[in-house]
């Protein structure tokens, strides 16, 4: 997740053509509705700049094109990636684009499982932002290799494709190698595009339709994944592919509840010592109540404006005090690394950007775009000005559970921005058919079957599981690769309660 740079956010909001912005912020003092705010605030007409691209010829003869059987305006380009050229992995790989006419082009990279690709599950991985590339997951967290300082791949023995085939999709439009003339600035629109991609993918790989299929991601994927799963449940009731579960790591899914847990996390109630003074903690605690009122107005409104205001206030009041400490918003244990990419705090992400901009890498993958960036500010700004970040998506998690589709909410317990306290809280308050039974379950130790070490805490009832992972920040696979792999292997094997098999029935 690319956290909101507070100066950047405030500059954007000040650019709104409104004579007295303070008049809008006076609403924070009471529970006044936003009945007249639509007339008072005027959003810029163009909140997302047109992409400036250096494009290659996408009529590349190395691509095979599959035309959608449902809508011929959509197609999927597919090419084999020679594993020996890049050395990311030795397994079979494909890359390409989903195209919509000449206006939208979504890039993906697909890796077969290292184990049994004909029968192993398939996982779609999504990073967050909004506006950040899923190649962060591929080349920095959980993929077959990471990129070293010498720009060479480093084999990852804990890759999630050890026992699953992995799809890394660059979405929404404008992220990474994806491009187009249209603008996508809401989770709802992004979800529709991702769903169509999945339909086309399984048309191109029909032998995989019966395999278990999981959607996984982190951070802002806590928005994306519920929306995509909702699209599948609503539009694909006969399941032309087999949606088996979803997994969300350190996600932002229910902003109203999660915002209440910044102060506890910063002030010593999340298992780590306080990083703010008692005075700052008291001030933040008071601000949380005001943030909650604004988020309630956002949830109740059909307009984006209350959500934009909620985002601006809550981030200023609840993120800025923490950011001023100099600590990493993704890992409360220390500051950002030196020489890291802008706003992302990790030097290794700079290596990924450099690697993906090598002409030989782009040529091997068949990219239509020469300029790669791990996070796109235009996409981020577009989502900001729809208020998307403050909108709720937990209702679609309830929909999945009520359809008996398993959901895993996992969280590294040293993250601040999407911390484990907030994720535990919203999952506990989720309205679904077995809410009360789930609430009665207590967190219990999650113990490694490999080492016998306690890796975290787990809570489960039926299809719903919450997992706290010790000593991991925002990106669990990066901080705890062994635990991350054990987690995903257990989950996709059907052990939803993360229990010893002898006690699994009682635990679930």
From Swiss-Prot:
Residue stretches in coiled coil: none
Family matches, as Gene3D superfamilies: 1.10.287.410, alpha/beta hydrolase
Enzyme class: hydrolase
Pfam family, one: Peptidase_S10
One annotated GO biological process: cellular response to nitrogen starvation
Active site: 219, 415, 474
Induction: Expression is induced by nitrogen limitation in a GLN3 and GAT1-independent manner.
Sugar-bearing residue positions: 163, 242, 339, 371
Key words of the record: Autophagy, Carboxypeptidase, Disulfide bond, Glycoprotein, Hydrolase, Protease, Signal, Vacuole
Outcome when changing residue 415 to A: Leads to partial block in enzymatic activity
Name this protein carries in UniProt: Vacuolar serine-type carboxypeptidase ATG42
Species: Saccharomyces cerevisiae (strain ATCC 204508 / S288c)
Gene name per UniProt: ATG42
């Amino acid at each position: 997740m690319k956290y909101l740079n507070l100066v950047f956010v405030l500059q954007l909001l000040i650019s709104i053509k409104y004579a007295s912005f303070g008049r809008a912020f006076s609403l924070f003092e009471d529970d006044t509705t936003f009945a007249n705010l639509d007339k008072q605030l005027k959003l810029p007409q163009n909140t997302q700049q047109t992409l400036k691209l250096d494009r290659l010829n996408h009529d590349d003869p190395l691509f095979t094109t599959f035309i959608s059987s449902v809508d011929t305006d959509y197609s999927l380009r597919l090419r084999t990636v020679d594993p020996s050229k890049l050395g990311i992995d030795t397994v079979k790989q494909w890359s390409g684009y989903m195209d919509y006419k000449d206006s939208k082009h979504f890039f993906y990279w697909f890796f077969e499982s290292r184990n049994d690709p004909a029968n192993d599950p398939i996982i779609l991985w999504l990073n967050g932002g909004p506006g950040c590339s899923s190649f962060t997951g591929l080349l920095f967290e959980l993929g077959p290799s990471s990129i070293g300082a010498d720009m060479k791949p480093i084999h990852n023995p804990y890759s999630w494709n050890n026992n699953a085939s992995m799809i890394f999709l660059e979405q929404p439009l404008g992220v990474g190698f994806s491009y187009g003339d249209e603008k996508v600035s809401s989770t709802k629109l992004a979800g529709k595009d991702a769903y169509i991609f999945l339909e086309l993918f399984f048309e191109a790989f029909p032998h995989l339709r019966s395999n278990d299929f999981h959607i996984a991601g982190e951070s802002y994927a806590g928005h994306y994944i519920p929306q995509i799963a909702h699209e599948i449940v609503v539009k694909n009731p006969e399941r032309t592919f087999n949606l088996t579960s979803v997994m969300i790591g350190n996600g932002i899914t229910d902003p109203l509840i999660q915002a209440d847990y910044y102060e506890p996390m910063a002030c010593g109630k999340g298992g780590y010592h306080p990083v703010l003074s008692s005075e700052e903690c008291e001030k933040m605690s008071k601000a949380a109540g005001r943030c909650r009122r604004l988020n309630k107005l956002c949830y109740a409104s059909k307009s984006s404006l209350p959500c934009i205001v909620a985002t601006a206030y809550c981030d200023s009041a609840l993120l800025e005090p923490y950011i001023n400490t100099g600590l990493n918003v993704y890992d409360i244990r220390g500051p950002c690394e030196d020489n890291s990419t802008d706003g992302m705090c990790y030097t290794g992400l700079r290596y990924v950007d450099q690697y993906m901009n090598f002409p030989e890498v782009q040529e091997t993958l068949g990219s239509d775009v020469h300029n790669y960036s791990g996070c796109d500010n235009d996409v981020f700004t577009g989502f900001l000005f729809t208020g998307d970040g403050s909108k709720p998506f937990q209702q679609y998690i309830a929909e999945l559970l009520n359809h008996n589709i398993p959901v895993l909410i996992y969280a590294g317990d040293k993250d601040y921005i999407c911390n484990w306290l907030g994720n535990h809280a919203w999952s506990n308050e989720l309205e679904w058919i077995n809410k009360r039974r789930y609430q009665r379950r207590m967190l219990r130790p999650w113990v490694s079957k490999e080492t016998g070490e306690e890796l975290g805490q787990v809570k489960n009832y039926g299809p719903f599981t919450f997992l706290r992972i010790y000593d991991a920040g925002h990106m669990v696979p990066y901080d705890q690769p062994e635990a991350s792999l054990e987690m995903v292997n257990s989950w996709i094997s059907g052990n939803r309660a993360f229990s010893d098999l002898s006690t699994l029935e009682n635990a679930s």
